[in-house]
Amino acid sequence: MNIDFSDPDFQYLAVDRKKLMKEQTAAFDGKKNCWVPDEKEGFASAEIQSSKGDEITVKIVADSSTRTVKKDDIQSMNPPKFEKLEDMANMTYLNEASVLYNLRSRYTSGLIYTYSGLFCIAVNPYRRLPIYTDSVIAKYRGKRKTEIPPHLFSVADNAYQNMVTDRENQSCLITGESGAGKTENTKKVIMYLAKVACAVKKKDEEASDKKEGSLEDQIIQANPVLEAYGNAKTTRNNNSSRFGKFIRIHFGPTGKIAGADIETYLLEKSRVTYQQSAERNYHIFYQICSNAIPELNDVMLVTPDSGLYSFINQGCLTVDNIDDVEEFKLCDEAFDILGFTKEEKQSMFKCTASILHMGEMKFKQRPREEQAESDGTAEAEKVAFLCGINAGDLLKALLKPKVKVGTEMVTKGQNMNQVVNSVGALAKSLYDRMFNWLVRRVNKTLDTKAKRNYYIGVLDIAGFEIFDFNSFEQLCINYTNERLQQFFNHHMFILEQEEYKKEGIAWEFIDFGMDLQMCIDLIEKPMGILSILEEECMFPKADDKSFQDKLYQNHMGKNRMFTKPGKPTRPNQGPAHFELHHYAGNVPYSITGWLEKNKDPINENVVALLGASKEPLVAELFKAPEEPAGGGKKKKGKSSAFQTISAVHRESLNKLMKNLYSTHPHFVRCIIPNELKQPGLVDAELVLHQLQCNGVLEGIRICRKGFPSRLIYSEFKQRYSILAPNAIPQGFVDGKTVSEKILAGLQMDPAEYRLGTTKVFFKAGVLGNLEEMRDERLSKIISMFQAHIRGYLIRKAYKKLQDQRIGLSVIQRNIRKWLVLRNWQWWKLYSKVKPLLSIARQEEEMKEQLKQMDKMKEDLAKTERIKKELEEQNVTLLEQKNDLFLQLQTLEDSMGDQEERVEKLIMQKADFESQIKELEERLLDEEDAAADLEGIKKKMEADNANLKKDIGDLENTLQKAEQDKAHKDNQISTLQGEISQQDEHIGKLNKEKKALEEANKKTSDSLQAEEDKCNHLNKLKAKLEQALDELEDNLEREKKVRGDVEKAKRKVEQDLKSTQENVEDLERVKRELEENVRRKEAEISSLNSKLEDEQNLVSQLQRKIKELQARIEELEEELEAERNARAKVEKQRAELNRELEELGERLDEAGGATSAQIELNKKREAELLKIRRDLEEASLQHEAQISALRKKHQDAANEMADQVDQLQKVKSKLEKDKKDLKREMDDLESQMTHNMKNKGCSEKVMKQFESQMSDLNARLEDSQRSINELQSQKSRLQAENSDLTRQLEDAEHRVSVLSKEKSQLSSQLEDARRSLEEETRARSKLQNEVRNMHADMDAIREQLEEEQESKSDVQRQLSKANNEIQQWRSKFESEGANRTEELEDQKRKLLGKLSEAEQTTEAANAKCSALEKAKSRLQQELEDMSIEVDRANASVNQMEKKQRAFDKTTAEWQAKVNSLQSELENSQKESRGYSAELYRIKASIEEYQDSIGALRRENKNLADEIHDLTDQLSEGGRSTHELDKARRRLEMEKEELQAALEEAEGALEQEEAKVMRAQLEIATVRNEIDKRIQEKEEEFDNTRRNHQRALESMQASLEAEAKGKADAMRIKKKLEQDINELEVALDASNRGKAEMEKTVKRYQQQIREMQTSIEEEQRQRDEARESYNMAERRCTLMSGEVEELRAALEQAERARKASDNELADANDRVNELTSQVSSVQGQKRKLEGDINAMQTDLDEMHGELKGADERCKKAMADAARLADELRAEQDHSNQVEKVRKNLESQVKEFQIRLDEAEASSLKGGKKMIQKLESRVHELEAELDNEQRRHAETQKNMRKADRRLKELAFQADEDRKNQERLQELIDKLNAKIKTFKRQVEEAEEIAAINLAKYRKAQHELEEAEERADTADSTLQKFRAKSRSSVSVQRSSVSVSASN
């Protein structure tokens, strides 16, 4: 880079090399110098002092303080040679600290531009720098990036050069947050392009005195105008653009500017009437109040004081560094340069001033009226004057606007708030329209009509904003920035890497985590924020609260980008309703007023008034939109009446993104250095945040790793083959080979480039080096070429001099000879006689020549006349030819249009057919729903009849109860006086109560309650009154239930009636649509026939036109030949004239005739005669040719006239057809209007439905949209009817193709019917299989009950064994050591029984292996069934596709769908039955688990007893040899028993897993229909947690094992010190070591099996999910589900049988073990050496059993979730039971009262008591019946409600299914990755534990070697152990505790 640093232009662009050398030579230690995090500076420079583990002590360079930081927090520091680096992609260490330091160091040195790979970073300097002058522009023009310091001009020049060389549109995206300097950089880019590519000025333009500037000046001066009207002061930026603009600068073929245009986006209109305290309105308001141009004050009627106007005095009035006076003058000058007239300027200023006066209009409320009135008219008159309207009309339109009610206009009163809002809306609308007009006017000036080839677009959009109060405008701005950032990320990170993959380059995809699509989808997708806002704007009663509720309902908790706002972090922060997570930060938004802002309402009366304004500009701004011409095309999308602000912004933003994607982008990232707007100050945290959000580091990384420069092979070969000409082989070679040879010839490093499929890719900077090499080679070649050219020119001049020299010598020689001959007399005579030889007969010849000349003149005139006629005819023919050619071209164009339209019509027809099919399917669904409702209605009517009957019975019962109550009241009055006598009769009452208990056992509980209540007779009266009150309450409740049932009945009847009416309307609409379709098909067929005829005519015309063209070409050739002949004759005539003149001269000189002259004259005469004859023949030929041409022309003219007549006839015929079609279209449109009205009625009726009919609403709305689309298509057809005649060939071809397809589809329909019949037969077969499954399930239930009984027997036997053990223990403790011999005998018996148990264990193992084989076989069968299900799904899918292709099969499909629906309901019922059975199976499994737990506890108790017994047996002093033998034998028996128990438990767990899988499969069928995808996510979360817990439990067990090994090592070390106490323990350790090895191997095998089972379960879940997703979309998949159920039931049956066999075996084992317990005491002496090993093994067994229990419980968690619904039903039944018990208690109280009455009145006798008792029983029975009926009624009501809710939610779930499935797939993929990562971590942990175990094993082996040395002391230990029993007992207890 050759830079003159003394040049002042580079002071703020490049660092002085002398200063930089000092900085680059500073001391540096790469191992010590580093960056550490710092709260204030972001990162601080430090030196590493020491390190300890993950913590490092560093010394801060700035203050010499020390600090301890983590190793991961330290970032590497670049060497000093990278100081103030211009391109950060060249850094050695790329990290945040280095980037921040480089930017800060350059910024503090005044260098604001830095390259960052492919884009440029610009830091706001907050001051003016002299780096944008013309001299700087000249220095950057045409320079490469590496030749000159970083600058914005370099980016602009690069874009310009790319446009010129690559012939591709370019764009400069200048992005950043608000206040980062985007607007200023945009102006500099435009200025640079205007200077570099300025067009050549004309002299007359330079000499003119007009104020209009050149095109470049106009482009530059457009910015001040737009800034005045579109920029304002905000809290972060004094000159913030409150609108977005995309400036396109167009260039011509030569690279010169050919024009420009500006597109604007989203002007912030709300700022016109409201600003925050620290902000300002738009600059133009303060400029017109600055008194900069005093003469305008009178025009605008403004006072030069901005504080007087309420619209602009809400914030600050002045801004630092902005002079409103000077800015207004610049703005006025810019208007002049842009060509605005004085009238246009004044009109704009008037409109601007009128907005100020609108803000001063005052209104007040009339007392006691809802009407406002004007509080003064001065400001209104000013507004009216400036806008050119009447003040009274303006006030009237504001205060009393007219609204249309029906067909009449009614005056509406406005209150004060409404009027003020209307004025504000008018001001905002006026300003918005004026701004848009200003942009259009500027574009008109910048449009030069010159030829445009390419353009460079410069984008300046309002930056990302986070204010204290963020509203709708901030959402739109931030949404735009989100899209632009996504474009940057996609272009930089995604497209770049995708191109590598596409080109076949070896590249590993890098995910930078910069995808913003989730946030964008949240805003713009259907049911996103903007979509919900637009939907709410269409509802008249919608408000901010309803909008907020919809947002929360759709997104809160469902999208992590949408959250509730946190607590305000700033004191001035306004209230917020939700918070979005944007790429630049979290922004809280307030939705207050969003609906009004989005609808942008305005008073239509004022609009109409302003449209008729006297001011031309105001009238133009508010003129009514022009109606489209009749038959013209209508715009797609919403009409202008419904075009909301969000929809317009989204449409314009999509257009902008489309433009950007079509260009080659260049990015400039603007950075805010600090919030204080101070130059030279860098806020590290703020800058780092912007770098992270903008993807700066990621952009640098991909620039360094990737290959940003690329060229296609042809361009590379053409441009760089000059560098290696010898490397290119001769002949044809493909571009890739040539490029590879060129690169090889240049000896380039292969790491610097890659060869793709079509392009060659280079690392950053490599292409610049190639350009430099090319320039050097070109300079050498040019120098050689210049040398060759100069040599050639010199040689050519030398040769010319030689030729001149030869010519001079020849001339000199001839002159010398002439000088010799000139005095010779014979020469003189010769020279005199020679002229006289040709003078003979000159006069005669002259006369003849004159005659010939006259004749030739006549012929020539005649020929000229004929020539003119022919030329005129030729011109006429050419014109006709051109007309015909134009007509042909028009016909061809219209044919192309018609072809497209025919294709669209065919597609539309297909769409309509599919829509009709969908409507028919929906009608079928609705008919099914109506049928269901009819059944429900009938059932409810029957229930109502029963209820009426029951209510009548209850009323009779209540009447009787009331009579009884009156009677009982009388009795109570008598009882109150006799309470004291009741104590004597208590015994008698008790005896009678016992007799009643014997008589009726059912009332035993109630009699017991009566005995209890007899003790509280003093409370009898209150209790009886309470019972009566409860009866009355029950009666009221029953009445209320009856009323509710009646209401529900009436409502259901009404709903059913309206549904039937809707169905009838839909059927009628369907029939009409079918009739229209048939009519249209007939019309199309007629049109096709017409088109065929006209096609033949057109083909004939085309052939004739081609013949005429050939004839015309022949005529043109003949005319050309005639012209050539005429020219030849003219030339001959001129030569003859010249010869005649020469003859005349010679005759004059000769004066006489000689014989020679006479002979010569004869020859001349003969020649003249010959010439004359030739002329006559030529004239005759010409005349013949002319006559032939005339004839041909006449024939051609006649043919053309005939063709024109035929075309006129065709035209008239087509116009007639057009009128007929138009009339038919009008009829069809009227019919569609009628259909629309019917549809509206249907919608009104449908809105009356409850939530169960919401799916009908959605479908009807779809139908309405399809009808609207049909209408729009019809309107387009009206405009396109005139061009239908030109679609003949394609229409004919398509008709033939359609006929073929129709025949093919008809054959496919027959195949589909046959396959459907086969499917029906298969379905019936499956139904039979399901019935068989029911029978199998009953058998399974019975077997489970039997297993439960056997389990209870086992438990009883175990309890008996425990009792026996306790007895033996107590007996042993009493008898002591005297029973040792008996224990030995019993031990031998126990050994025999243990051998038998070993045999049973082997048998159990064999059974387990058989079960495993059965499991694998069942798994294979399950996979086969899933394949069959997939095949069935595919066939059903194919049949559904075929079904949609035909209308004729609709009725057949309806019947089939109805049958499928009934089958689906039956399957659902069966599924519910299966679920109930599975609940019972689950209960049995829980009981099994309890029994297993009991067995485990019993096992532990036995082990404890053995432990105690061995402790006691240690006192016996038996021999070590016998103990060793017994220990080994028992150890083997224990291992075998434990293995058998583990295998049995594993088999049981497998069977439980099988049962659970079957249960989950059946439950998933119902859950998939009810709960859909959410349930699946919960299942996968549970599965993930279960697997995680399982892995954790295995890890814990391994860790516990390692810990146990460590404890064992400590114990061994302690026992080595005391060898006498360690002999038995060492043997146990040796045995324990072998056991541990086996245990570890077993654990490893279990881990592998667990992993395999996890993967297998995951695969099975994926397969099940796929099948269930298919079941959701197609009801016919129920056949596949039934097959799965059958397979599951068969598997459950096999599992049940296997478990039954295993249970029987287990029972046998338990019986054997129970019989063996009696012999345990005899074997206690030989169990002493096994205590420690058995205790360890038992602990491990317990750990494994606990893990198995946990896994089983986790597997049961899903089943427990399914039981929640059953529990809810049980709770409800409990409540009903409570009510029943209350009634029973009342009956009991009646019984007590009867007893008391009987006791108190002995006179009544037993007859009265019996009568009362019978009455009580009757009441009790009636109450029970009533409660039962009430419960049935409630159950039926719940079923009906559940069915209605299912119908309501089904449609919504189907619509959302696809999106949820996609999200679920993504989530599941992420979860699978997480699971894999967790499994890998678990494997690593297992490997670590295995290493620990091996280490422990090694230590154990060493301990064994040491133990061998202790054998010599074994005899001493035996003698010592016999003498000291107490020492042995203590040692054994210590080892047992360890």
Curated annotation (Swiss-Prot):
Comp. bias (Low complexity): 1922-1938
Region: Disordered, residue numbers: 1041-1062, 1187-1332, 1344-1363, 1898-1938
Keyword Cytoplasm appears in the UniProt entry: yes
Gene Ontology MF: a single term: calmodulin binding
Extent of Basic and acidic residues compositional bias: 1041-1058, 1212-1225, 1286-1303, 1310-1332, 1344-1354
Localization, UniProt: Cytoplasm, Myofibril
Region (Rodlike tail (S2 and LMM domains)): 836-1938
Domain Myosin motor, chain residue ranges per copy: 83-775
Protein name: Myosin heavy chain, striated muscle
PROSITE patterns: IQ (PS50096), MYOSIN_MOTOR (PS51456), SH3_LIKE (PS51844)
Organism classification: Eukaryota, Metazoa, Spiralia, Lophotrochozoa, Mollusca
Family designation: Belongs to the TRAFAC class myosin-kinesin ATPase superfamily. Myosin family.
InterPro entries: IQ_motif_EF-hand-BS, Kinesin_motor_dom_sf, Myosin_head_motor_dom-like, Myosin_N, Myosin_S1_N, Myosin_tail, P-loop_NTPase, XRCC4-like_C
Subunit field text: Muscle myosin is a hexameric protein that consists of 2 heavy chain subunits (MHC), 2 alkali light chain subunits (MLC) and 2 regulatory light chain subunits (MLC-2).
Superkingdom of this protein's organism: Eukaryota
Domain annotation IQ: ranges: 778-805
List of residues binding ATP: 176-183
Record carries keyword Oxidoreductase: no
Function description: Muscle contraction.
Domain Myosin N-terminal SH3-like: 29-79
Start and end residues of each stretch annotated as Actin-binding: 653-675
Record-level GO cellular component terms: myofibril; myosin filament; myosin II complex
Record Pfam families: Myosin_head, Myosin_N, Myosin_tail_1
